[in-house]
């Protein structure tokens, strides 16, 4: 072993200087005693000195090797220290962008029983650590037991104090979890406790593989999200929240074929580096842990079920000229058309009357079974342990069938809505959502819940609802050239204070997909924007419905993320969308 390895500083290290000093003192002690000693005593003293010298050398080399191993990380500036309690591996996005990382830091301790010169040690620490209160240093240096002095020292700060060569001053290496992007994707990434245990998000869901990665097993945990998509989603969601001041808001982007979550936002958000200082409301992952009555976005499922069961076609008609009386209740349309509507028009005008009539044709048993097949009666299948259980009807009577057909009487999470919408848009196959990146080209095996024909028809119907000038409720989400489709949703919230639904308290959303053209197997994405109790303003003419507050934000998200996802605008669609007859329609439910 070379002398350069005897701890930081090699032969110039404090440890090596200490060994040399001890040998020098022994040598001078020998010189002082030899004059008065008898010859045989002189020989014994020399033997003792030689043995002592080699003993000191052995101790020095051993300690130097140990100290070198202990503090090698500071010199190397990388890697994970084996055996560090709570150590975790890196977390990255689908493109390798760093999302979470362990950074080494050190805690400084003083053991007064091992201090050689208390006054010198106290003075040196006072100069090196001016931020530490004097009383704490006094207690640590002049006390009677080992005491903590300061934590959070960087490797450079630790080395500077170590090189002072102060016996009794020691360090303990610890890991601090850092999130380089701060609040970006905080709800999806999650956070850990002081011991390095995952408490939320991917940190909790993937706790075991992330811990194993710290030991070099399996590499970093790679999530499905794209930070470029995530940043655009969060930015537009924040703008919508600032404009319409809701209680909370949710944004989602998924790949409909793979179930990969490319972006997930919950507002208000928090900085994952300061999770302990965030409020419960900020830490709440509304995309996974909150459930809502989704309102008219459910009409997409009801229409698809009607087509799939064969009780209706796109040309089937429904008389919406008068309110529909069903048992003891009367169903109205928000924007009464007072017309006979075909199925596409029922969807475009978001007709409660037409949708309830369709659900009655389907029947309660079949409707509830389809909802179950679409995953709407169970928590969304995803790694996140926050995934909430829905609130579902106890019985499927005539009133329940009508209510659930247009999104009332069932509370589900936004993730559950996305999972079901994926099946609606990918050719009819149910697949779980995932927060982990899948290998390129891999599409998990799915369970068929709708026919390919039904899925293809729904893509056309959802596109018709967004095409400008066609009278659909989603026109404000259109992006020329990207073939956007979607469905607005405005669900009134039940108010216990008045024991009925309160039209002043709404959950407003827009469920979008793009591109709707091309074959069923073509790449396709789902986008959701949801605002909980938004407030209308002058820009929305006082309306707080999904078509006014959520659809525009969804369109802006799609326009920004399409280039990242490789979706190119098509010139012929730009021409159609910009034709003179296509004035923007009134956005509705």
UniProtKB/Swiss-Prot annotation:
Belongs to the transpeptidase family. The active site is at residue 296. The active site is important for FtsI localization. It is found in: Cell inner membrane. The keyword Cell division applies. The gene is ftsI. Interacts with FtsN and FtsW. This is Probable peptidoglycan D,D-transpeptidase FtsI. Its EC number is 3.4.16.4. Its main location: membrane. The chain crosses the membrane at residues 47-67. One of its GO terms (molecular function) is serine-type D-Ala-D-Ala carboxypeptidase activity. PROSITE patterns: BETA_LACTAMASE_A (PS00146). It is a single-pass membrane protein. It comes from Caulobacter vibrioides (strain NA1000 / CB15N).
